[in-house]
Amino acid sequence: MAAAHVILVSDSHLSASAPQAQANWDAVVSYVGASAPDLVIHLGDLSLDGARSAADLRHGRTQLDRLPAPWQAVPGNHDIGDNPWPGALVGSAVDAARHQRWLDIIGADHWPVTVGGWIVLAINAQLLGSGLAAEAAQWSWLEEQIGRHRGRRPVALITHKPVTATGSELAAAPPYRFWPPPARGRLARLFGGTPPALVMSGHVHQYRLLRLDGTDHLWVPTTWAVLPGHAQPLFGAKRCGIVSLTLTTGTPAQQELIEPDGLEQLTLTIDLPDPYHS
């Protein structure tokens, strides 16, 4: 089977009120037009505040539709709200209305796609631990998909939040950075002794490739702005950009960090104000 070229994009934080985010997005659109990928996947936080603003989410949809290539997307915490966790701000959690708004404006929040002989399973990580009916339905779907494809073709996962990290990183992390531990354990049990070949995530605004227990964990950087050192430790590379991914049957995934022409390297609180903690 021929190789498939996929562009991975994440954490764009788009809004009509965010010109810096828009300028960097324009650079992504131009790069996609020049590189002609088979698919573009957005890994969440498409919008600046879609969890509270339907206008931001609609703006994000308009920008996705500008891409001169087929696209798919999963929601992030700023699109539909976060996983419930102790100490979270009141009103920050995902709920049924926010979830439905994503479905109405953007489309499916979890989906399978076959590219380059691989099966890519996209998961709505924001539902995990929510107790919503949609969470149970997604787990049932995921179990069926894993059972169908595990051992038959390479399996890759798409999720906004990283599933895991090193033991020391997990121990030191705030509860909102990675998957909730119960969900992480349930995923491992579903895969059993045949883990996914690749897990792709965003959320952390850093580029990283980490191999753990037979799985490559690829962190896709932000197209908007990285976080300063006092707000987040360094895990990989704090660079704004996208990832070019090549998938071929029988070959490990090939990936490369891309910094498109015109995409500015920005740091939150230094180069632009923090809209979430002002």
Place the predicted regions along the sequence by residue:
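Residue-level marker for buried hydrophobic side chains located in beta-strands
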Residues: 6-8, 40-42, 73-74, 157, ...
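Short acidic, glycine-rich surface-loop motifs adjacent to enzyme active sites
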Residues: 149-168
